[in-house]
């Protein structure tokens, strides 16, 4: 029997949103400050990209959102900073979700960046390695941060 305390969205099969996007829209409209999507990283590439875009929808509205899986964690930064302790056996990647992300700084890693411009047509931030606690910050634009098992 279903737990009545957990809301269930009854959605039509044919709709403009994916199920994940509908859930993210609902959570944003309900005023949630953080959204965690589990088991949304595997399977079809088109769905993964759609899930990342759903994170962007939340981010544009000031809501922190992440995709969490067994072997990876994905989240976005916009005019923000984050500190991530070393995760042995995992890489750290940063990519531009928007056309460009300005003033990207990464320290505590093998390949640091200082006040860099990161664009979505050049993957300069892929597969970095921890040398200590990583500090990541960015200005204008949306930065995609990925911790993935090597």
Predicted regions and their residues:
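Acidic/Gly/His-enriched mid-domain segments of enzyme catalytic cores or analogous surface patches
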Residues: 1-60
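Short coil/turn connectors at secondary-structure junctions
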Residues: 4-6, 31-33, 61-64, 89, ...
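A glycine-rich helix N-cap at a beta->alpha junction
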Residues: 12, 62-66, 93, 100-101
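Cofactor-binding loop segments of dinucleotide-utilizing enzymes, especially the Rossmann-like FAD-
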Residues: 40, 70, 148
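Short, well-ordered, mixed-charge alpha-helical segments that flank or form enzyme active sites
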Residues: 44-48, 74-78, 113
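Class I SAM-dependent methyltransferase SAM-binding "motif I" and its flanking Rossmann-like core
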Residues: 56-87, 95
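Long, charged alpha-helical interface segments
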Residues: 77-150
């Amino acid at each position: 029997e279903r737990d009545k305390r957990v809301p269930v969205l009854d959605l039509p099969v044919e709709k403009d949103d994916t199920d994940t996007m509908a859930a993210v829209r609902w959570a944003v409209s309900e005023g949630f400050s953080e959204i965690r999507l589990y088991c949304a990283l595997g399977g079809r590439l088109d769905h993964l990209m759609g899930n990342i875009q759903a994170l962007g929808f939340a981010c544009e509205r000031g809501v922190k959102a992440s995709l969490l899986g067994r072997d990876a964690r994905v989240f976005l930064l916009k005019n923000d900073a984050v500190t991530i302790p070393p995760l042995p056996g995992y890489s750290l990647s940063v990519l531009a979700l928007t056309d460009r992300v300005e003033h990207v700084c990464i320290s505590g890693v093998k390949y640091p960046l200082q006040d860099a411009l990161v664009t979505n047509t050049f993957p300069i931030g892929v597969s970095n390695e921890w040398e200590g606690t990583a500090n990541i910050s960015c200005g204008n634009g949306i930065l995609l941060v990925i911790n993935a098992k090597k």
